[in-house]
Amino acid sequence: MAFQGTSRTLTQQSSAATSDDLQKILFSPEAIKKMATECDLGRHHWMRADNAISVRPLVPEVTHGRIASFFKSGYDVGELCSKGYMSVPQVLCAVTRTVSTDAEGSLRIYLADLGDKELSPIDGQCVSLHNHDLPALVSFQPTYDCPMETVGNRKRCFAVVIERHGYIGYTGTTASVCSNWQARFSSKNNNYTHIAAGKTLVLPFNRLAEQTKPSAVARLLKSQLNNIESSQYLLTNAKINQNARSESEELNVESPPAAIGSSSASRSEAFRPQVVNGL
């Protein structure tokens, strides 16, 4: 027999008041602060020797409990069709190194389910990055929605796991990982197409790329040196100041405009001071 019921969204299944309650749970100042401090959403997480394994849930524990209670209360009175699911379409991690390229070490990053005691990668979605491969972008796509339940003493949800290997002699931060995602919550769930974890190696940022002429740095340094030399002539005698001012006036006399294409015009353009990005 074919199913003849109606499919309703979360907002349709609950009243406006309960929908507002859910919004307050997700976007209250406390919830936003917890997402930053407990989950490192949009923040840089430093991988150090004393933090070789990092497990970051995608939902704070307090927020998880409140969301689960919201769905359970609606489910118990028949307003919602389930006790709630967490859906994460994609997790994107930007990874950069904070040591030189010759440092021997690597990172292992994957997405796990806190309901799994072994914290195994979900559907084998795991990426290994050697230090000299960085920077890189890593992406994960869960193939199912996670039930909002408690397993033992663990609040079940997705988590980003980062393992640091090697880096002998480097006790400080060797890499920085910035993760971003958007968690969604619904009373309905689904399964999704399996997609392998994505790894995109990124070229290091070239701070001088916007300068087309190779002598831009030399011109900048020369202009700075000229400014330093001129600042050394601090004269206190009024008569000498007058002479210095007259010399300055002679130097500032405008010369006739050079013809376009002449060697003097090209030299004038070549020695115009420029600001180099990053210096």
Curated annotation (Swiss-Prot):
Which keywords belong to this entry?
A: Host cell junction, Transport, Viral movement protein
Instruction: Please state what the protein is called.
Output: Movement protein
User: Could you provide one GO biological process annotation from this protein's UniProt record?
Assistant: transport of virus in host, cell to cell
- What is this protein's function per UniProt? Transports viral genome to neighboring plant cells directly through plasmosdesmata, without any budding. The movement protein allows efficient cell to cell propagation, by bypassing the host cell wall barrier. Acts by forming a tubular structure at the host plasmodesmata, enlarging it enough to allow free passage of virion capsids.
Query: Family per UniProt?
Result: Belongs to the cucumovirus movement protein family.
Top-rank taxon of the source lineage equals Viruses
The subcellular location is: Host cell junction, Host plasmodesma
Q: Which GO terms describe its cellular component?
A: host cell plasmodesma
Disordered: region residues: 246-279
Keyword ATP-binding attached: no
Which InterPro entries does the UniProt entry name for this protein?
Answer: MPV
Low complexity bias locations: 254-268
